[in-house]
From Swiss-Prot:
Mitochondrial membrane ATP synthase (F(1)F(0) ATP synthase or Complex V) produces ATP from ADP in the presence of a proton gradient across the membrane which is generated by electron transport complexes of the respiratory chain. F-type ATPases consist of two structural domains, F(1) - containing the extramembraneous catalytic core and F(0) - containing the membrane proton channel, linked together by a central stalk and a peripheral stalk. During catalysis, ATP synthesis in the catalytic domain of F(1) is coupled via a rotary mechanism of the central stalk subunits to proton translocation. It comes from Pongo abelii. The keyword Transmembrane helix applies. It holds the Pfam family ATP-synt_C. The modification N6,N6,N6-trimethyllysine is found at K110. This is ATP synthase F(0) complex subunit C3, mitochondrial. The chain crosses the membrane at residues 83-103, 118-138. Residues 1-67 form a transit peptide. Trimethylated by ATPSCKMT at Lys-110. Methylation is required for proper incorporation of the C subunit into the ATP synthase complex and mitochondrial respiration. It is linked to This protein is the major protein stored in the storage bodies of animals or humans affected with ceroid lipofuscinosis (Batten disease). It is found in: Mitochondrion membrane.
Length: 142
């Protein structure tokens, strides 16, 4: 791959590309240095500048697509983080189901089982809220 890039890129294209990289796009499009150059070296420079202007046009064309991809990735990430809230609901159901089964087996341990159930409920709910917080961070903070 490096050999292909080395053959395809001339030094003038690399210089022109690095010059465009730190300039604003409007300045790169509006100021055409190939108009002021003449002679044998200008053909290579014109080819390099045309390649750079094609890259600039491609940037204008794909910026909307890039934004759409970023938005879709945000929604997918937020949806994946929201799955943790469903896991929290399943965990809470398991905790209180185990409380009922434990109380049915040994009613004398009612107070101790209930305190463990409250602890399990709190931990499961905290994980659900954490997943919901991450989903909102993905949607609105990124």
């Amino acid at each position: 791959m490096f050999a292909c890039a080395k053959l395809a890129c001339t030094p003038s294209l690399i210089r022109a590309g690095s010059r465009v990289a730190y300039r604003p796009i409007s300045a790169s499009v509006l100021s055409r240095p190939e108009a002021s150059r003449t002679g044998e070296g200008s053909a290579v420079f014109n080819g390099a500048q045309n390649g750079v202007s094609q890259l600039i046009q491609r940037e204008f064309q794909t910026s909307a697509i890039s934004r759409d991809i970023d938005t879709a990735a945000k929604f997918i990430g937020a949806g994946a983080a929201t799955v943790g809230v469903a896991g929290s609901g399943a965990g809470i159901g398991t905790v209180f189901g185990s409380l009922i089964i434990g109380y049915a087996r040994n009613p004398s341990l009612k107070q101790q089982l209930f305190s463990y159930a409250i602890l399990g409920f709190a931990l499961s709910e905290a994980m659900g809220l954490f997943c919901l917080m991450v989903a909102f961070l993905i949607l609105f903070a990124m």
